[in-house]
């Protein structure tokens, strides 16, 4: 089981004060560390801050979150808890449609 947390305000630019927001995200991560003891991550993107603690199941090294994916000049971010059982088949379909992948994680298949 993983832990996900974050906050969003379209009228704020959290990237302007990353130190304060990193402190807030760190406290959130510490609170939910028992839900994902293997690794953790965070990201601050303009009006959104995301945090994740991970219990590693698939792609132990490269499946860290929050994860980003860029396509056609747009960058998307995800924090996710779950498992996509047919992600290998979905990934094959997306590869035929010229999607590219940097990991073997089921999470990257979702965000693509």
Q: Over which residues does each language-model region extend?
A:
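N-terminus-centric sequence/structural signature that marks the extreme N-terminus
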Residues: 1-112
């Amino acid at each position: 089981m993983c832990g996900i947390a974050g906050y969003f305000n379209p009228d704020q630019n959290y990237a302007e004060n990353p130190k304060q927001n990193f402190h807030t995200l760190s406290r959130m991560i510490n609170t939910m560390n028992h839900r994902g003891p293997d690794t953790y991550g965070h990201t601050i993107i303009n009006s959104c801050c995301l945090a994740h603690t991970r219990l590693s199941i698939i792609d132990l090294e490269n499946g860290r979150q929050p994860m980003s994916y860029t396509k056609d000049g747009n960058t998307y971010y995800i924090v996710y808890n779950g498992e996509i059982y047919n992600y290998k088949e979905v990934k094959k379909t997306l590869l035929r449609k010229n999607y590219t992948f940097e990991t073997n994680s089921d999470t990257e298949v979702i965000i693509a």
